[in-house]
A protein has these predicted regions:
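Class I S-adenosyl-L-methionine
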Residues: 1-109, 114
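A contiguous loop/helix-start segment that scaffolds small-molecule binding in enzyme catalytic cores
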Residues: 2, 60, 70-75, 131, ...
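Class I SAM-dependent methyltransferase SAM-binding "motif I" and its flanking Rossmann-like core
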Residues: 11, 82-155, 182
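Short secondary-structure boundary/capping segments
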Residues: 20, 42, 67, 123-125, ...
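Residue-level signal for well-ordered alpha-helical positions
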Residues: 43, 118-119, 174
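Generic structural motif recognizing short loop/turn segments at the entrances and edges of beta-strands
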Residues: 46, 55, 128-130, 184-185
Length: 188
């Protein structure tokens, strides 16, 4: 069995209790290299086999999972944040489906919620915004035209924008082109 576990925002104590327990029980952990706090690996048992996936291909990750599953081992695939938001787990799950290997997901604390908590903020304020848009700028992965920053900014909702810190000047310009004012509060 493979468990996809969200590692949370980076602080080792922000992993979910379920995620921590899965790490403690794991026979094999495959973690996302520099993206996952290495302190989380301290939850692993003494005999746990640990693999850093930073330099592994998808095929190599799947091969580790396949061999461990054949041996009846419990596998944790440890991803940063919450793997359901920009976690790139679908291709792994598709391969596991093809191989007939069972898997489950254990959510993690997503960066947008960790950031709000660390700043004592909330995204939904009566009379201001009752919606939260989670999106990103174009990068290696294209964004559908109908999901442009400008089109989302037109809603004047709260936004959590991922994977875009290298594009801040362009992001600010596009948010204002979509309707946000220059004095709109923002947190990086």
């Amino acid at each position: 069995m493979v468990y996809f576990v969200g590692a949370g925002t980076g602080a080792a104590d922000l992993i979910t209790v379920r995620g921590m327990r899965l790490l403690e029980r794991a026979d094999v952990i495959i973690y996302a290299g520099s993206l996952v706090n290495p302190e989380l690996l301290a939850y692993a048992g003494k005999t746990c086999e640990i693999h850093n996936s930073a330099k592994l291909t998808l095929d190599e990750v799947i091969e580790i999972m396949k061999e461990a599953d054949k041996q009846g081992k419990m596998i944790v695939r440890l991803h940063t944040g919450d793997q359901s938001v920009y976690g790139a787990v679908r291709e792994q799950m598709d391969e596991l489906d093809r191989l007939g290997i069972a898997y489950e997901s254990c959510p993690g604390v997503s960066a947008c919620f960790g950031a709000a908590a660390s700043l004592n903020l909330e995204y939904t304020l009566p009379g201001v915004s009752q919606s939260l848009i989670i999106t990103r700028m174009e990068g290696k992965t294209a964004v559908p035209e109908k999901e442009s920053i400008e089109s989302f900014a037109a809603h004047q909702a709260s936004m959590a924008i991922y994977l875009s810190t290298g594009l801040l000047e362009e992001l600010g310009r596009r948010l204002m082109a979509g309707g946000y004012r220059g004095d709109t509060p923002a947190v990086l």
